[in-house]
Curated annotation (Swiss-Prot):
Pfam families: Ribosomal_L4. Belongs to the universal ribosomal protein uL4 family. Residues 42-100 are annotated as: Disordered. The keyword Ribonucleoprotein applies. Keywords: Ribonucleoprotein, Ribosomal protein, RNA-binding, rRNA-binding. One of the primary rRNA binding proteins, this protein initially binds near the 5'-end of the 23S rRNA. It is important during the early stages of 50S assembly. It makes multiple contacts with different domains of the 23S rRNA in the assembled 50S subunit and ribosome. This is Large ribosomal subunit protein uL4. GO terms for cellular component: ribonucleoprotein complex; ribosome. InterPro entries: Ribosomal_uL4, Ribosomal_uL4-like, Ribosomal_uL4_dom_sf.
Length: 217
């Protein structure tokens, strides 16, 4: 069953409504799938540049520290062996790629499940724009978002061309900005509420269904 959202303007006035396709916003939420996709996404974000030196990489230690026999001590061949201070590291981390291959269909299904969960709980909102006009205003944007939700973590999805909106909320704590083609399961689940501009919402729907939704008065 398709859901309908009221579209609100910065002044708080309802400017119409927009329909959310059930295939995108009323899909079953597969927790195991979302967990797998989020784990893969966070793993891919790791730099993987950590590195340690083995005894073969550490400089020095080419000479035998003392003779083999007659000292009463354990025999040693190099001061760069791992048991010595300044020696090499045993089984230490080396640079590696942590990314996992995740099929595109799984990524899309996980995102549908996350958005559907937010939609079913009334945590998706539609707006015409964050601020009126082309002048950024953090104060106005903060007040407007406060009328939509009192929760702390908010994901704002706006078009790439909306520079005034992006500049208005980019310094607000707890607010994260994405373009519609950057939407991902992790950021949706991390946010308490998701706020779409009509432009961004229509772009996301069109990209995933091929049929852009119109705003009705």
């Amino acid at each position: 069953m398709a859901l309908k959202l009221d579209v609100k303007a910065p002044g708080g006035k309802v400017e119409g409504s927009i329909e959310l396709p059930a295939e995108l916003f009323d899909a079953p939420a597969n927790i195991a799938l979302m967990h797998q996709v989020v784990t893969a996404q966070r793993a891919a974000a790791r730099q993987g540049t950590h590195s340690t030196k083995t005894r073969g990489d550490v400089s020095g230690g080419g000479r035998k520290p003392y003779r083999q026999k007659g000292t009463g001590r354990a025999r040693q061949g190099s001061t760069r062996a791992p048991q010595f201070t300044g020696g090499g590291v045993v089984h230490g981390p080396k640079p590696r790629d942590y990314s996992q291959r995740t099929p595109k269909k799984m990524i899309a299904a996980a995102l549908r499940g996350a958005l559907s969960d937010r939609a079913r709980n009334g945590r998706i909102h539609a707006i015409t724009e964050l601020v009126s006009g082309q002048t950024p205003s953090t104060k106005s944007a903060k007040a407007f978002l406060g009328t939509l939700t009192e929760r702390k973590q908010v994901l704002v999805v706006i078009g790439r061309s909306d520079e005034a909106g992006a500049k208005s909320v980019r310094n607000l704590p707890g607010v994260h900005i994405l373009a519609p083609d950057q939407l991902n399961t992790y950021d949706v689940l991390r946010a308490d509420d998701v706020v779409f501009s009509v432009e961004a919402l229509r772009a996301y729907i069109a990209a995933n269904t091929g049929t852009p939704e119109e705003v009705s008065a």
